Amino acid sequence: MNKFLLPLVALAVLASPCAHAQNLDAQRTAIRTAIDNAERGQFDANATAPLRNHPLYGWLEFSALRRNIDTLPTAQAQDFLKRYQGQAVAESFRSAWLPALARRQDWPTLQANWKASNDPGLRCAELNARQATGKADAQWTSDAQALWRGAAKSLPDGCDPVFAVLASRGGLTPALRWERIDAAADAQQPAVMRAAARGLPAAELAQANDYAAFVDKPDARALNWPKNERSRRIAVDGLQKLAKADPGAAELQLPQYAQALGLSAEQQGKVLYEIALWTVASYLPDSARRLAAVPESAYDERLHEWRTREAMARGDWPAALTAIRKMPASQRNDSRWRWFEGRLLEKTGKPAEATALYRAAANEPTFHGFLAADKLKQPYTLCPWNPGDSAAAKASVARDPALVRAIELFKIERPSWAAREWAEALTRFDDSQRRLAVEVASNNGWFDRAVFALKGPQELRLYNLRFPLHHDDTIRREAARNALDPAWIAAEIRAESIFNPNARSPANAMGLMQVLPATGASVARSIGLSGYGGASSLYDSDTNIAIGTAYLRQLMDKYSGLPYVTIAAYNAGPTPTARWQSQRPNYDPDFWIETISYKETREYVARVLAFSVIYDWRLNGNALTLSDRMVGKTEGARKAFSCQSAP
């Protein structure tokens, strides 16, 4: 065992909890500071000598070497790869070093240190290396052609020399160029189509550029295209792309191209599918008509759902029921559609037929399954699984060097590096060890591993791992302060950040409850939060929960105390929420949620409400009914949980 693991593992047994925590904190601060300094070009080998046996010392070295990657001596780089062979840090270094070797055209060294990769840039670097060292043999040609034909999208600039040599040797035949043009057309990449066409004979080049122009923006020149299968496929590609931006224009243009080029019913169906999809996704007035124009053979699960939602949004209950019954059995038997089939039977005067559907749905611990249990006035179905793993097995997994490094990297806020070490550890683990690794990670506050690494129906019953209890005191305090249910606050945190206080979204939402800086500042002022220091304060868990919970309270007051509308506004913002309210002002909550046009928000509202039920169970052993919870009733009867058929 690495000597430095003694403080990390043995002290957990030998030292007092307080001393152990202080020791670990000091070690983490030291390695974090050293890595930060190395990235700034301030690596001092003598000053960091005491860290040499730290599990993360390789990442410290990596940070220092990467800083000077373009001038790094080969011997030093190869020594690093040798010392850390088999570790994630070695492959991370290799991925940084090989492009540097390509930039300085050190082709022999690149070849000597090459390791198979799916990264197109690295593959091109290796092909350049082989070509430059006189190894552009038949295998080289085959490999270069495989890279070409598999690239529907643009490739890095480093690939241009590869394809130039391939073309000069006759390896980029017109047929191969057309193969990539076709792939790029399917991917709706007109610029790639044009680039791939260069080198075609003049007449073919003109036709290829015409095809690319059509995919970019359909025009009447296509009416005079050769009446062949390629023309038909590319016409479909271009019309599908147009349908996303302007479904009405695509609908108007389809008939003329269908007639001129002889589009098959299947090909026309693909375009009609996109026209209908991008119409109904915004509930435009022509939605029902355009959905009806799509052949049933062109429907997939996505469009089946939208046909059902569109009828629901119009309040056409018979049409919605018919739409569900046209779904394939595997889709129709999902708890969501069983629930809505039952609800629609009730709305069309057939309540007796709904009971069996509710019974089937109620067997699943989902949003719609919980609603079905409410309908039947029966306990919620929840079957926790206890694998009964031994402490020795867990301790063995916890000692895995890659897992130790992964957790330590997580602790010092290096999530991408932590994920690489985690992936490396999992390559050696069987299913039970993987499950135990999730438990070890959760015990160290790395809760999202339970979301990303647990698999299959049985592991999804590990509710203690999937729904962690953390920051309980703060959640309860802020929930009480704002007259909200703590289970709801926990569910929001679980849905927003999986209890990661350092989470940051592409939209710059920050912390546990993913609060935007502008919202944070506004809410902090409105509640008189002392000590709020700007956006960085949102990474403080107590501050984030205080602001996020107060913001939920403000939204609740704005939306008449209705949690399901409040949750939608928390995710999507006030403008779309106001639009959905005005479009369907008197809808039952379940139908209102299902007809939300944003997929993310539609799923988010149902997820948070279902998570609230599970967190209520975790906190209290029973739960407020979901039917009451959705509409803000907090004093109703509470419901027990039962397991009908757990193995």
Where are these regions (language model features)?
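Inward-facing hydrophobic residues that define packing positions of alpha-helical scaffold repeats
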Residues: 45-49, 77-81, 110-114, 141-148, ...
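Catalytic glycan-binding domains that act on GlcNAc-containing polysaccharides
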Residues: 57, 62, 256-259, 263, ...
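Generic helix N-cap/helix-start motif at coil->alpha-helix transitions
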Residues: 22-30, 52-59, 71-73, 85-94, ...
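Residue-level detector of the short coil/turn that links helix A to helix B
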Residues: 41, 105, 134, 188, ...
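Alpha-helical adaptor scaffolds
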Residues: 65-66, 81-82, 94-99, 269-283, ...
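N-terminal leader/linker segments that initiate helical-solenoid repeat arrays
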Residues: 19-69, 382-403, 411
